[in-house]
């Protein structure tokens, strides 16, 4: 779809759900503080399920994990992950494509005027996506480090064990 031709539709989405498209600062969950974009009420859903997959999974094992997590999402679970490993990416992509609710953790925070783009904007408008950033925004194009990956997975675990 042409970007300019799509402007009126995107504006309508932002007007109908303004809170889903504003950066929310100091959002508290499970004793932690985040910057967020999207449907913060996903954190209040009864079941949050962490998606964490070993990098050593084979393709058939990844497909098995995808099936497992999609079945849980069909039953109402909100999937939570930084989507780092190939398996985590496959699960979150399949769930996103199917329209299931997701909480995505990202390493880089948000600028004040940040907005989700493309299909993420659609997902936010539908209330199916929450993007959380536990750390401040940086302009440098930095590769994520192992310690950050471990921390993001620990944050996902803590969000899911909050009760």
Show the residue positions of the predicted features:
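Short catalytic/metal-binding and nucleic-acid-binding patches
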Residues: 1-32
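Glycine-biased, small-residue-rich flexible motifs in mid-sequence functional cores and linkers
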Residues: 23-163
């Amino acid at each position: 779809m042409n970007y300019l031709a799509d402007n009126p539709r995107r504006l309508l989405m932002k007007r109908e759900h303004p809170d889903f498209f504003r950066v929310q600062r100091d959002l508290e969950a499970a004793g932690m503080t985040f910057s967020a974009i999207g449907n913060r009420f996903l954190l209040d859903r009864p079941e949050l399920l962490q998606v964490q997959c070993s990098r050593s999974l084979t393709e058939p094992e990844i497909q098995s994990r995808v099936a497992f997590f999609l079945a849980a999402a069909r039953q109402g679970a909100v999937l939570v992950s930084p989507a780092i490993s190939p398996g985590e990416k496959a699960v979150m992509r399949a769930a996103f494509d199917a329209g299931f609710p997701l909480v995505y953790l990202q390493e880089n925070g948000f600028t004040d005027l940040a907005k989700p783009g493309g299909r993420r904007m659609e997902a936010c408008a539908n209330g199916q996506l929450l993007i959380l950033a536990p750390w401040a925004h940086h302009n440098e194009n930095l590769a994520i480090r192992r310690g950050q990956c471990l921390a993001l997975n620990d944050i996902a675990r803590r969000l899911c064990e909050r009760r």
